[in-house]
């Protein structure tokens, strides 16, 4: 991969954090009144983590960020910016990023949230890269994805309740040697499809909305799956062609874990072998904006992603928003 931009930027450290509580799909099946086999075969999630009393998205994000900084060998006070992707903040004001800045001790960083739902972390990566390119004095940006969707799920909705889990993932982004790091990032939004996934804490502000469950996430699952099946092949083809590669040249495919069964299907149809696909959704569910960084951190800690490897990231989120990025794992990245 030789066509990366002159000012190359890459991931030099990863971290993640999951809640303590494990929720087996047998428990979910009993809550929904469906067979356990139905969840396993239709969704592919065996268990997920739900935040318990006292656990917050902010706390998960702060621990993931601290781990990423530690692995990168970067002191908190050297961080120039924190970009945090979430669509489930505990409060709209202040943003989660500001709380994380305080928690990790990144006193010199400016911090703010972005919301592109499950696709938000990739938007954060594009934003972070822009910051580093715009000012040579900036050295390090923390990009965090954190969500607690369990708190906006309807336990009676079989379209959403089996899918999601809570968690946070983080990376440290910095300049890396030429020919390494992140290549072109492509992100698209079609607001006409905004009704495909709707919900969230904002509706809690009205008593009637709370009583009627308006804060619960609702999804048109079949429509979302159809969009993924349509757009996924083009995302893959465009990414590899731009760098003069083929699917076989991609060492690792890290996808948003919307539905593990769907991830396996579209990856196989695009020509990927099972060994190329990083799968986490089967054991932690769909962790929304945390999905991609958790996938990266998992593969790094497992020793799968190594310096020089080619990694393709693909994401989808409400909006609808979808995107991709191809990168060569930097030599400066630490396991």
Language-model segments: what does each one mean?
Residues 12-15, 85, 115, 141-147, ...:
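Short beta-strand segments
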Residues 11-13, 39, 68, 79-82, ...:
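Buried hydrophobic positions in well-ordered alpha/beta secondary-structure cores of metabolic enzymes
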Residues 1-53, 155-226, 230, 234, ...:
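Condensing-enzyme catalytic core mediating Claisen C-C bond formation in acyl metabolism
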Residues 64-80, 234-251, 299-304:
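Phosphate/pyrophosphate-binding loops at sites that engage ATP/ADP/AMP, CoA/4′-phosphopantetheine
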Residues 58, 62-65, 69, 88-89, ...:
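Claisen-condensing/thiolase-fold acyl-transfer catalytic domains that form or cleave C-C bonds
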Residues 45-47, 78-83, 102-115, 150-156, ...:
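Glycine/charged-rich beta-loop-alpha catalytic/anionic-binding loops adjacent to active sites
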Residues 32-41, 91-105, 143-149, 204-209, ...:
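Acidic-glycine-rich active-site phosphate/pyrophosphate-binding loop
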Residues 133-168:
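Flexible, glycine-rich active-site loops centered on histidine and acidic residues
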């Amino acid at each position: 991969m030789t066509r990366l931009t002159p000012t190359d930027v890459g991931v030099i450290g990863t971290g993640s954090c999951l809640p303590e509580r494990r929720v087996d799909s047998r428990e979910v099946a009993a809550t929904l009144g469906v067979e356990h086999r139905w969840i396993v075969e239709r969704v592919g999630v065996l268990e997920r983590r739900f935040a318990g009393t006292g656990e917050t998205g902010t706390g998960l994000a702060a621990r993931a960020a601290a781990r990423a900084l530690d692995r990168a060998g970067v002191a908190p006070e050297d961080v120039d910016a924190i970009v945090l992707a979430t669509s489930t903040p505990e409060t709209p004001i202040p943003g989660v990023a500001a709380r994380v800045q305080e928690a990790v001790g990144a006193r010199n960083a400016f911090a703010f949230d972005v919301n592109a739902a499950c696709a938000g972390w990739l938007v954060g990566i594009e934003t972070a890269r822009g910051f580093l390119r715009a000012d040579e004095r900036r050295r390090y940006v923390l990009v965090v994805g954190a969500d607690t969707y369990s708190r906006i799920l309807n336990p009676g909705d079989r379209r959403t309740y089996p899918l999601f889990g809570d968690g946070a993932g983080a990376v440290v982004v910095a300049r890396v040697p030429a020919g390494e790091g992140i290549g072109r990032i492509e992100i698209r939004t079609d607001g006409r499809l905004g009704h495909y996934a709707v919900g969230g804490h904002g509706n809690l502000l009205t008593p009637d909305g709370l009583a009627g469950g308006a804060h619960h996430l609702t999804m048109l699952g079949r429509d979302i799956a159809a969009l993924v099946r349509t757009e996924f092949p083009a995302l893959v083809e465009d990414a590899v062609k731009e760098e003069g590669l083929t699917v076989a040249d991609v060492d690792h495919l890290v996808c948003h874990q919307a539905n593990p069964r769907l991830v396996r299907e579209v990856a196989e149809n695009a020509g990927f072998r099972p060994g190329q696909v990083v799968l986490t959704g089967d054991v932690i569910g769909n962790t929304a904006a945390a999905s991609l960084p958790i996938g990266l951190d998992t593969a790094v800690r497992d020793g799968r992603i190594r310096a020089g490897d080619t990694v393709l990231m693909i994401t989808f989120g409400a909006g609808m928003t979808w995107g991709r990025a191809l990168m060569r794992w930097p030599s400066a990245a630490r396991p």
